[in-house]
Swiss-Prot record:
Expressed ubiquitously, including in seedlings, leaves, stems, inflorescences and siliques. This is Protein HEAT-INDUCED TAS1 TARGET 2. Keywords: Cytoplasm, Nucleus. Induction: Target of TAS1 (trans-acting siRNA precursor 1)-derived small interfering RNAs in response to temperature variations, thus reducing both basal and acquired thermotolerance. Up-regulated by cold (at 4 degrees Celsius). Repressed by trans-acting small interfering RNA (ta-siRNAs) siR850/siRNA255-mediated transcript cleavage. Highly up-regulated in seedlings exposed to heat shock. Induced by HSFA1s-mediated (e.g. HSFA1A, HSFA1B, and HSFA1D) promoter activation. The keyword Nucleus applies. It is found in: Cytoplasm; Nucleus. GO terms for biological process: heat acclimation; response to cold; response to heat; response to oxidative stress. Belongs to the heat induced plant HTT protein family. It comes from the Eukaryota. GO terms for cellular component: cytoplasm; nucleus. The gene is HTT2. It comes from Arabidopsis thaliana (Mouse-ear cress).
């Protein structure tokens, strides 16, 4: 048995487990970039009839492997150094289409901080064919939503988002303006758009502070300042949801 075979065998024995150092680091982390989860919410979401054939292949993949595969591919470190920005759903989707993804049994944890094993590049992967469709327009995002859930990024203010509960999230509220702080953009998936309390709202699924939840987001709220200071200014009025995208899977 060669080294690669022994490596694959050892992974099969430890499926579903993660390195203790990674578990400890994760438990100490207040929040994390959930783009790795968002990609799977989108790709495992509703499919058109033309794409139903993908269900079986996608179900064999793990939503927990994308960040590890990104690290293995060597793309993550290079892109983060060049851009000095966190990965987005679009980045992860493009990596999936370009490199393929490992299967469920090969990785156990999203965002594993433990060093990738030396033979990680030999892990078998499921090929993915398709392209990433982007739009900046909310109207175009609504059209995409007819066929499947849409990925987006949400401007997050704390404690406004923490305290929204069953209400409608409107970003920085006047009641908590003094104690609010701008956290940044977080990846979400838009699952529905409807009326609530007389407002047009989007229901989004979000991973925030290690919790997955559904939040109603006001679509009519616009602002030009995210918080205090010049760095918080945006170039033009913006809504709470931005950077919409979906994967278009190909059968060719």
């Amino acid at each position: 048995m060669n080294m690669i075979q022994r490596f694959m065998q050892s992974m099969a024995k430890t499926r579903g487990l993660c390195h203790p150092d990674c578990v400890k680091a994760s438990s100490e982390q207040e929040d994390y970039d959930a783009s790795q989860l968002s990609i799977w919410w989108i790709m495992l979401g509703r499919k058109t009839t033309r794409e139903k054939w993908m269900n079986q292949a996608l179900s064999s993949l793990s939503k927990t492997c994308i960040s590890i595969w990104w690290k293995m591919s060597g793309i993550r470190g290079k892109m983060c150094r060049e851009r000095e920005q966190p990965l987005t759903v679009k980045d992860c989707l493009e990596c999936a289409f370009k490199k393929g993804l490992p299967r469920r049994e090969h990785w156990a944890h999203v965002g594993c901080t433990f060093k990738a094993p030396p033979f990680a590049c030999h892990i078998p992967r499921v090929p993915m064919k398709g392209e990433v469709i982007e739009t900046k327009s909310l109207d175009e995002a609504f059209k995409l939503l007819i066929k499947q859930p849409v990925g987006a990024r949400l401007h997050v203010f704390s404690p406004d988002l923490d305290n929204v509960g069953e209400g409608v999230y409107e970003g920085l509220s006047s009641l908590s303006r003094k104690e609010s702080r701008y956290v940044g953009l977080r990846d979400v998936i838009i699952v529905a758009v409807n009326k609530s309390e007389g407002k047009t709202v989007a229901t989004v699924k979000i991973c925030y502070k290690k919790k997955t939840s559904f939040v109603k987001v006001c679509l009519s709220r616009m602002f030009v300042q995210l918080g205090g200071g010049e760095e918080s200014q945006v170039k033009e009025p913006t809504g709470l949801l931005v950077d919409f995208c979906i994967p278009r899977l190909s059968i060719n």
